[in-house]
């Protein structure tokens, strides 16, 4: 895979839409947003979690038609394997990989805290060597699908014990004022 340094962002319009991205209300608008990003020199497009699956399909198809790298969050009602079926070249953030094994009550929730809290609650008990995670990882490897796990953003959610400081910060606990 070739990393894409320049990426536009697209999300479905609404109160939970990604800040700083282009928001869309239809498949046609998703296609137009991808074309605009391409025309402005972006080599990749990142989709966010508020995208309707039909809009996502249209945007991904257009991005690939234009030779763009497709990556991003996995929208509500979809799992990582669904995003790959639609055409993602990369899954961004480890919580969306973990989403493959989450219950529907987590997967079907729109963008928001539940998409973080769910993996925080359930990922600790996932067997990474068993389906559905092992199947997903094998598929990603065979198809050249990559992940940008951004572990630093999720380590505290996925590893911390209730009432204890995240291991990543414990070494620094005495070096900063308590209010930080």
Place the predicted regions along the sequence by residue.
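Surface-exposed amphipathic alpha-helices with a cationic face
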Residues: 56-67, 141
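Divalent metal-coordination and catalytic microenvironments
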Residues: 3, 41, 63, 72, ...
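Aromatic/hydrophobic pocket-lining residues that form the small-molecule binding cavity
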Residues: 30, 56, 133
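Structural recognition of alpha->loop->beta junctions
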Residues: 79-102
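Generic hydrophobic/aromatic pocket-lining and core-packing "Φ" positions
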Residues: 34, 60, 80-81, 137
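Active-site mouth loops of central-metabolism enzymes
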Residues: 14-29
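Active-site neighborhoods of metal-dependent hydrolases
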Residues: 5, 33-51, 97-180
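Glycine-enriched alpha-helix->loop->beta-strand junction motifs that scaffold or abut catalytic
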Residues: 65-67, 85-91, 144
């Amino acid at each position: 895979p070739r990393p894409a340094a320049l990426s536009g962002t697209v999300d479905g319009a609404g109160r939970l839409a990604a800040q700083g991205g282009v928001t869309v209300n239809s498949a046609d608008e998703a296609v137009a947003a991808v074309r605009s990003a391409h025309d402005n020199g972006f080599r990749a497009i990142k989709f966010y979690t508020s995208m309707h699956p039909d809009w996502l399909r249209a945007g991904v198809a257009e991005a690939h038609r234009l030779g763009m790298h497709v990556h991003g969050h996995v929208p509500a009602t979809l799992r990582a394997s669904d995003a790959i079926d639609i055409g993602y070249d990369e899954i961004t953030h480890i919580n969306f990989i973990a989403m493959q094994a989450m219950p529907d009550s987590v997967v079907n929730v729109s963008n928001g805290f539940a998409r973080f809290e769910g993996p925080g609650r359930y990922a600790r008990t996932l067997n990474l060597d068993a389906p559905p995670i092992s199947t997903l990882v094998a598929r990603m490897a065979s198809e050249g699908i990559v992940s940008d796990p951004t572990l630093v953003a999720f380590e505290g959610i996925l590893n911390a014990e209730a009432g204890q400081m995240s291991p990543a910060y414990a070494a620094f606990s005495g070096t900063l004022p308590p209010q930080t």
